[in-house]
């Protein structure tokens, strides 16, 4: 298995350290956010149009969840231009600051990189490195 630090470019590691410092203090009131949001946990339902299953609730800022929405949209076209448009649109629709949504999306993509290395998934690794670079 590859070492995560050997796989991630120094520029992205440096950016992650900067983002960690920026995100250490929440922006706004603490809300219940979901630590395990992914498309496998969002299902169509009868009582609601969409239902989030298997939640992992934490207290955090609203931009944390917006960051996930940004990250999954950027996966379809991991370019800086597309990422910028997605960040602006998602932040506006979520009523959160765009810089915070971008920062959380970047950090979640870095987490995906770690998982891809651990799971030895080269395609996922390439995708999430591109997403992180687009959001950096």
Where are these regions (language model features)?
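Hydrophobic alpha-helical segments that form the core
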Residues: 104-111
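Hydrophobic residue at the +6 position relative to the catalytic HRD Asp in the kinase catalytic loop
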Residues: 40-42
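ATP/Mg2+ or Mg2+-diphosphate-binding catalytic cores
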Residues: 3, 111-136
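An alpha-helical support segment within catalytic cores of ATP-dependent transferases
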Residues: 1-35, 45-47, 92
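A general structural motif at alpha-helix termini
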Residues: 16-17, 70, 105
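Short, well-ordered beta-to-alpha junction loops that form the rim of enzyme active sites
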Residues: 35-37, 106
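Active-site Asp-x-Gly
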Residues: 44-98, 122, 131
């Amino acid at each position: 298995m590859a070492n995560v630090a050997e796989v991630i470019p120094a520029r992205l590691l440096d950016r992650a350290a900067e983002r960690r410092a920026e995100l250490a203090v929440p922006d706004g009131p603490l809300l219940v956010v979901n630590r395990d949001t992914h498309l496998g946990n969002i299902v169509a339902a009868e009582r609601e149009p969409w239902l989030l299953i298997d939640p992992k609730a934490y207290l955090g800022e609203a931009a944390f969840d917006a960051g996930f929405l940004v990250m999954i949209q950027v996966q379809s076209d991991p370019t800086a231009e597309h990422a910028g448009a997605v960040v602006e649109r998602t932040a506006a629709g979520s009523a959160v600051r765009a810089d915070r949504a971008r920062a959380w999306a970047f950090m979640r993509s870095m987490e995906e990189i770690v998982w891809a290395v651990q799971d030895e998934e080269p395609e996922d690794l390439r995708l999430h490195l591109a997403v992180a670079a687009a959001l950096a």
